[in-house]
Amino acid sequence: MQTKYDFKKVEHQRYQQWLEKKYFCANPNANKKTFTVVIPPPNVTGKLHLGHAWNNTIQDIIIRFKKMQGFDVLFLPGMDHAGIATQNKVKEQLKQEGLLTKTLSKEIFLKYAWQWKEEHAQNIRQQWQVLGLHLDYNFEKFTLDPDLSQQVQEVFGKLFQKKLIYRDYKIINWDPETKTALSNVEVNYHETEGKLYYIKYFLVDFPTNSNLSDASLVPSFLEIATTRPETMFADQALMVNPNDPRYQSFIGKKVFIPDTNIQIPVISDNYVDINFGTGVVKVTPGHDINDFEVAKRHQLKALLCMNEDGTMNDLALQYQGLDRFVCRQKLVQTLKQKGFFTKTENHLHKVGYSSISDAIIEPRLSLQWVLKTKAIAQIALKTNKINFFPLRFENIFNNWLQNIEDWCISRQLWWGHQIPAWHKGQEIKVQIESPGPEWSLDCDVLDTWFSSALWPFSTLGWPNCNAPLFQNRFPTDVLVTGYDILTFWVSKMVFQSILLTHKDPFKDVLLHGLVRDNKGQKMSKSKGNGVDPLEVVAKYGTDALRWFLTTNAAPGFDLFYDETKVASSWNFINKLWNISRFVKLNTSTLDTDFDINLLTLTQKALLTQLHLTTQKVTTLYQKYELKEIGKILYHFVWEDFANWHLEFAKHDLDQNNSNLTNLHNSQKFLVYMMKHILQLLHPFIPFVTDALYENFDNKTNITQTTLQKTSYCNLDALADFENLKNLIIKTRHLRQESNINCKLNLELEVASQFSTILQDFVNLQQALEKFFKTLQIKITNKVTNSKKTIWLIEKNLSLYIDRKTLNELNETKFESNFLQQKNTLLKEIKRSETILNNPSFLQKAASAKIEIEKKKYESYCKQYKKLLESKNNSNPLNPNKK
């Protein structure tokens, strides 16, 4: 066994060995209970980040522990085609190669996209391997696999037939850069410093030949404030609150869109906030979701003044062809020149940015395919029996379902699931095969989340409900995901599963938080504060990263990355290595069949602690409390096992102190403990525990073992050992407080009225003398010498020390304290005397200040006198003083 822990040597090729020996393969013929986790599919767009590493490691720990409990586990891998993200990445790569997407056919582009997928899928697999994930690659899935694509298109057809899918105009998040609709989860909102532009809309009956900038005239106009003046070309009305007295006379009249001949009405609606801005708002239904709803109530048209790429269209008149922001700049300049402009104010507001292109999102009216969700959500609310961890997220989930809006499921992309809809004029047919040559296939693909919503059951053989995987492993046992996509993904999986399979997709949902830097900022590419998990692994090893990720945040809470804690994780693993090495060097057997009747008190206590620890850990796994499990295991390994038991074990393993029977029994016991500890830690740190386990079991790999059951529980022995520990700890503290040299031996007696305790202590006598650092220790049921005095009491135990020795120690301590206080007081007395004997001080200082110094001097003198009197009396630390 290597002297030092070297994670590179430990982890090198170990995962490949696991794969070659098929350790991760599910066994449908095992006649065991099944446990299944389907991995949340990462986007096939590049490197995994710390969030992926955290999420995957949590699942891996759960899978490995369930396997050690005897379950037939399946951790199913897979990846998401990530429609818009992948298409954008491929476009960037082609651009670097001198190819523009607009010059390529859809077929050629998709050929490049599939090449991209194959390259990056392999990168993700390699990162999974680095993390040590217990994945069965025989069942790996990709959301664009032919069978999954078939399922998706069939589901679309079924939902269309049930009139749950329809086609209509909707205001959607539009990315002008990628020219597609985005889901809400693909939009990042940032506080942005913008402008609020105040613009005049003149009444139609205002004389058009007047000079609008003439201050002598009082023009009749309404003033609005907007952050997006360039959208005014699509305005359909101005709107005021019907209860606002300022604008009652304007309701029903018409105004001109500034610098145009286009007339729009002034309407009233309670939607307008009287106290915000001027109390007048422009209504632009084609470019604002709230205005679109207003338009429905007031029968207004919805027009667009922008093209799909964010440039202005013909409605913008002379600004046609300009980028929206260039148009804004030139339009404001013109409005100022012509008297339509009042002022500009700085305005901090939230602006949506595309997570794909980082372009500012444009709310846009667009013809899209939409899924009705309200009825499905109500069914899900009534029937789902999913357990949420933490429980508080159940309310968030239910509230979302209660207020859910219809879902825009179409995207204007090439890469994705083709919508199986065919058009001929105004006719639409939804089917996979073409109805005939005169029919054209719909240009759109489905939102990535549509296929992801089918992931828990589409990967298990559905819609073939007789498929063995589906029959035996659906619903899956637990979904582990971030709370940030609870509403975007989890909710969709739930209502799709209940609608299509009449079952919940999973039994439990475990939600974790976000990964943040040590300043509390969310890690992201745009902020440049991200950490590559592969770089962490290269420095500290996979096991250290896994331990850090899963023991530093409770379920539902964010994880704050701190490299010093990763280093501490490495230190813990290094400690485990040294512990294992000690056990290996001091044992000459692999047997674990020790005789319980030969165990010492410390061994009985440790075996009881192991039993209780295993029970606690098993219970906590049911609640997915990995942080708490890590805390318990850390304490048990470092404190209970290493700091205490191994110190006693050194005596048990000393051939000069033990008979051969006890020696061999102690060795077997130690090997048993070591194997069990490695098993408990294995789900968290699989590489090092596998390497160490090989030293104690040459037949079975740790990944294939079942966690040993513990039944021995001697609470009396544990209590006695805890009492003994407390005596030892208190003795050490008293040595320290009394400045007793740790090398100074003391004659002690340990007394107890209980014979069983005394017998255990007799067996430990030599070890106790080492711990107490005494010349001689006597174990008795009563004080054997009247000159002994009690020093410490711990429940059923009493510790005695020679009275003379204790007095001497107390006197030494007292003398030290006396001299320290004496020197301090003399120093202060001398300082005060010097000041009070200084003529300059007495002449110049205020009388109050002189008086204060005199009182100080008197106080110091009194304290000094009292100290001398106490010295002449007896030692106050003398325990016999009455």
UniProtKB/Swiss-Prot annotation:
GO terms for molecular function: aminoacyl-tRNA deacylase activity; ATP binding; valine-tRNA ligase activity. The keyword Cytoplasm applies. It holds the Pfam family Val_tRNA-synt_C. The keyword DNA-binding does not apply. A motif ('KMSKS' region) lies at residues 522-526. A motif ('HIGH' region) lies at residues 42-52. Keywords: Aminoacyl-tRNA synthetase, ATP-binding, Coiled coil, Cytoplasm, Ligase, Nucleotide-binding, Protein biosynthesis. One of its GO terms (biological process) is valyl-tRNA aminoacylation. It catalyses: tRNA(Val) + L-valine + ATP = L-valyl-tRNA(Val) + AMP + diphosphate. ATP binds at residue 525. CDD domains: Anticodon_Ia_Val, ValRS_core. InterPro entries: aa-tRNA-synth_I_CS, aa-tRNA-synth_Ia, Anticodon_Ia_Val, M/V/L/I-tRNA-synth_anticd-bd, Rossmann-like_a/b/a_fold, tRNA-bd_arm, tRNAsynth_Ia_anticodon-bd, Val-tRNA_synth_C_sf. Its EC number is 6.1.1.9. Residues 849-873 form a coiled coil. It is an enzyme of class 6 (ligase). SUPFAM superfamilies: Anticodon-binding domain of a subclass of class I aminoacyl-tRNA synthetases (SSF47323), Nucleotidylyl transferase (SSF52374), tRNA-binding arm (SSF46589), ValRS/IleRS/LeuRS editing domain (SSF50677). Monomer. NCBIfam families: PRK05729.1, valS. ValRS has two distinct active sites: one for aminoacylation and one for editing. The misactivated threonine is translocated from the active site to the editing site. The C-terminal coiled-coil domain is crucial for aminoacylation activity. Belongs to the class-I aminoacyl-tRNA synthetase family. ValS type 1 subfamily. Catalyzes the attachment of valine to tRNA(Val). As ValRS can inadvertently accommodate and process structurally similar amino acids such as threonine, to avoid such errors, it has a 'posttransfer' editing activity that hydrolyzes mischarged Thr-tRNA(Val) in a tRNA-dependent manner. This is Valine--tRNA ligase. The gene is valS.
